[in-house]
Swiss-Prot record:
<dbReference type="GO" id="GO:0000814">
    <property type="term" value="C:ESCRT II complex"/>
</dbReference>
<dbReference type="InterPro" id="IPR036388">
    <property type="entry name" value="WH-like_DNA-bd_sf"/>
</dbReference>
<keyword id="KW-0813">Transport</keyword>
<dbReference type="InterPro" id="IPR008570">
    <property type="entry name" value="ESCRT-II_cplx_Vps25-sub"/>
</dbReference>
<keyword id="KW-0963">Cytoplasm</keyword>
<comment type="subunit">
    <text>Component of the endosomal sorting complex required for transport II (ESCRT-II), composed of SNF8, VPS36 and 2 copies of VPS25.</text>
</comment>
<dbReference type="Pfam" id="PF05871">
    <property type="entry name" value="ESCRT-II"/>
</dbReference>
<protein>
    <recommendedName>
        <fullName>Vacuolar protein-sorting-associated protein 25</fullName>
    </recommendedName>
</protein>
<dbReference type="GO" id="GO:0043328">
    <property type="term" value="P:protein transport to vacuole involved in ubiquitin-dependent protein catabolic process via the multivesicular body sorting pathway"/>
</dbReference>
<dbReference type="InterPro" id="IPR014041">
    <property type="entry name" value="ESCRT-II_cplx_Vps25-sub_N"/>
</dbReference>
<dbReference type="GO" id="GO:0042803">
    <property type="term" value="F:protein homodimerization activity"/>
</dbReference>
<comment type="function">
    <text>Component of the ESCRT-II complex (endosomal sorting complex required for transport II), which is required for multivesicular body (MVB) formation and sorting of endosomal cargo proteins into MVBs. The MVB pathway mediates delivery of transmembrane proteins into the lumen of the lysosome for degradation. The ESCRT-II complex is probably involved in the recruitment of the ESCRT-III complex.</text>
</comment>
<dbReference type="InterPro" id="IPR036390">
    <property type="entry name" value="WH_DNA-bd_sf"/>
</dbReference>
<dbReference type="GO" id="GO:0005198">
    <property type="term" value="F:structural molecule activity"/>
</dbReference>
<comment type="similarity">
    <text>Belongs to the VPS25 family.</text>
</comment>
<keyword id="KW-0653">Protein transport</keyword>
Length: 174
C-alpha cells in the first residue's frame, strides 16, 4: 500500500514557513499531520533531523522543494508540544516520534488482551510485540521503548504489572 500525500505536498509554498501567524498555524498543523501519517505508514519511531531533510516527507523531488532544517526543527518543536515527539539529545538532532502516544498503544494492547480472553496472563515483551498471536495487530513490531511506555501507562491504570523475568521483562494483565 503506497502512502497518500496530502494536496499541500505538491504546493510549493508549503515548503516555506509562512510569515502570517494564522497561515503558519494551519501550515504547521498540516506538517504535523503529514509527519505523523508518514511515520505511521512507514512504522518509523526515530528520526534524525539532517536525514529527515532528505527523506521524501520533507523533500518533494517532483516539485523540487524541500523544507529547510530550521523549518523541520519548527515542525518537530510543534510535535513535541503536542506530545508526539521527544528529543534524544540536547543538540536536538535525533528524536523519538510517537504517531500514537503510549497511552493509546496501551489501550490497543489491553483491548487485544481482553478480546482474546488473556486477562491474568503473563507475556514476555517479545511475545507481545513480535509473537505469532499478535501478527495481525497494529502494535505488532512495536519498538521496545514504546512498548515499555505503553505497559507503564497500563500499570499506572492498574491494568498491568511489568515484571522482571530471567530472560528479560514480561507483563501480567489484570
Amino acid at each position: 500500500m503506497s502512502f497518500e500525500w496530502p494536496w499541500q505536498y505538491n504546493f510549493p509554498p508549503f515548503f516555506t514557513l509562512q510569515p502570517n501567524v494564522d497561515t503558519r498555524q494551519k501550515q504547521l498543523a498540516a506538517w504535523c499531520s503529514l509527519v505523523l501519517s508518514y511515520c505511521r505508514h512507514r512504522k518509523l519511531y526515530t528520526l534524525d533531523v539532517l536525514e529527515a531533510q532528505e527523506s521524501p516527507v520533507f523533500n518533494n523531488k517532483k516539485i523540487e522543494r524541500k523544507l529547510s532544517v530550521e523549518a523541520i526543527q519548527v515542525v518537530f518543536e510543534e510535535l513535541r508540544k503536542k506530545g508526539n515527539l521527544e528529543w534524544l539529545d540536547k543538540n536536538k538532532s535525533r528524536c523519538l516520534i510517537m504517531w500514537r502516544r503510549p497511552e493509546e498503544w496501551g489501550k490497543l494492547i489491553y483491548q487485544w488482551v481482553s478480546k482474546n480472553g488473556m486477562v491474568n496472563s503473563v507475556f514476555t515483551l517479545y511475545e507481545l510485540a513480535n509473537g505469532d498471536d499478535t501478527e495481525k495487530e497494529e502494535f505488532h513490531g512495536l519498538e521496545d521503548w514504546m512498548l515499555l511506555r505503553s505497559l507503564q501507562a497500563l500499570q499506572t491504570d492498574g491494568k498491568a504489572e511489568i515484571i522482571t523475568m530471567d530472560d528479560g521483562k514480561g507483563v501480567k494483565f489484570f
